[in-house]
Amino acid sequence: MPEVTLRHEFDCDEQTYWDKTTFDQAFNERLYRDVLKFPGYELLSLVDDENAKTRRVRIDPPLGNMPAAVKKAVGDRFSYVEEGRFDKKTRRYHFQIVPSAMRDKAKTFGELYCEKLGDNRVARIARVTVEVKVFMVGGLVEEKILGDVRHSYEAAARFTREYLKELGLTA
């Protein structure tokens, strides 16, 4: 299964990273709608208990310049639900993507975690794995998804730095 690991550094502590970005509704609204230009973003649920934060988000990504074979496989409209759980003890966010099309043939899952680099500096590591089992186009779809993941995480990292600075939360 193809996998990508991305690392981005931010001038904040780990708690600020999680609270003011990953689990902050205003941040995510701006990220998905304004920065990434996704047609749809909706927080379906966020449950915070003593052990974990569990979140479900529905996302409608732009289909844009998708190869014809891929577009045929997923259809004219595509969305997905991200189901994630942040374990407060291990401080890792594990997620899976439930697509609106090809549910039995496509798997995307991963994890996010932070490494402390200093008093007010962290590296956010994102590891994403993709598997698409569709004859003839599976590899194309995997390539498209991983390319989109790389692009989205790079844009999100730039926005995260700007957003933290805008809020006065950077070191």
Please identify what each model-predicted range represents:
Residues 13, 23, 76, 148, ...:
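Short amphipathic alpha-helical segments
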Residues 42-96:
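Glycine-rich portal/gate segments that line the openings of hydrophobic small-molecule binding cavities
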Residues 1-66:
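Hydrophobic ligand-binding cavity/cleft-lining segments
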Residues 53, 80, 85, 94-146:
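Beta-strand/loop substructures that line and gate deep hydrophobic ligand-binding cavities in soluble
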